[in-house]
Amino acid sequence: MAELACFCYPHLEKDSYKFIPFNSLAIKCMLTAKVDKKDQDKFYNSIVYGIAPPPQFKKRYNTNDNSRGMNFETSMFNKVAILICEALNSIKVTQSDVANVLSRVVSVRHLENLVLRKENHQDVLFHSKELLLKAVLIAIGQSKEIETTATAEGGEIVFQNAAFTMWKLTYLDHKLMPILDQNFIEYKITLNEDKPISDACVKELVAELRWQYNRFAVITHGKGHYRVVKYSSVANHADRVFATYKNNAKSGNVTDFNLLDQRIIWQNWYAFTSSMKQGNTLDVCKKLLFQKMKQEKNPFKGLSTDRKMDEVSHVGI
């Protein structure tokens, strides 16, 4: 995750802003600079290489002292920064909005995936600039629309029916912020269209998840799509979701947290997010993740959760 101010800076033109991507040498210069505390939140002028990000975001970049940041000296950083600027320059951002826009925290991996989709000649985003910009505006929180299959971050499609598409995420292969844990495996489920879904389509998806992905929990980060994650990573997702929800509420970026379909979401996660929306503390909410829930009546007749051991999926082992 990183603020948009880590990728570009605003230049005032008449009554709105044009956004310009940073170059890696300007960032490198900022990372070595001694900057007064009162200027930590201001864009840094490298004199030689142009404007650089505010020094308060130093930890967002990979250095000898910090291996958890972005690999900003890669060509992928330039591609992501340019894509963000193209999207922001396609809309009007006024003086009253610019600080709020640049402080927004976005998923770096999501944006890298959109670059990969843009470069894939077989992908619809390669052929439609309009759809590509729409996908980026959704990714950076500048659009109220949800991420549907056409505008999704992408990955490898492992399941699809008339209503849903399930993607295996490919973060292990990334250049900007690759996941280094070789055991990482995670999926995302997007809606093909943002419209009511038939029970038959939901039943098909639930059957697929119970049969093939029973070692995973189906959760949501509240943005209109599902995530299918290992049970061992659920607590980590809970910390991130709670922190983001609270930060958004604090900064005034209040968006409705979409709980999605209770028949698909893991029961304990639904309880956690419902409790979070009610204003409870993280500790109170997280207890619900590890609590034995009363089994709800199966909403789909004839769809059993009981499996013999030799029938259980080996995905995720």
From Swiss-Prot:
Keywords: ATP-binding, Host cytoplasm, Hydrolase, Magnesium, Metal-binding, Nucleotide-binding, RNA-binding. ATP binds at residues 107-109, 188, 221-223, 227. It is found in: Host cytoplasm. GO terms for cellular component: host cell cytoplasm. Belongs to the rotavirus NSP2 family. GO terms for molecular function: ATP binding; metal ion binding; nucleoside diphosphate kinase activity; ribonucleoside triphosphate phosphatase activity; RNA binding. Residues 205-241 are annotated as: RNA-binding. It comes from the Viruses. Its main location: host cell. The active site is at 225 (for ntpase and rtpase activities). Its EC number is 3.6.4.-. Participates in replication and packaging of the viral genome. Plays a crucial role, together with NSP5, in the formation of virus factories (viroplasms), which are large inclusions in the host cytoplasm where replication intermediates are assembled and viral RNA replication takes place. Displays ssRNA binding, NTPase, RNA triphosphatase (RTPase) and ATP-independent helix-unwinding activities. The unwinding activity may prepare and organize plus-strand RNAs for packaging and replication by removing interfering secondary structures. It comes from Rotavirus A (strain RVA/Pig/United States/OSU/1977/G5P9[7]) (RV-A). Homooctamer. Interacts with VP1; this interaction is weak. Interacts with NSP5; this interaction leads to up-regulation of NSP5 phosphorylation and formation of viral factories. Interacts with host DCP1A, DCP1B, DDX6, EDC4 and EIF2S1/eIF2-alpha; these interactions are probably part of the sequestration of some host SGs and PBs proteins in viral factories. GO terms for biological process: viral genome replication. Its cofactor is Mg(2+). This is Non-structural protein 2.
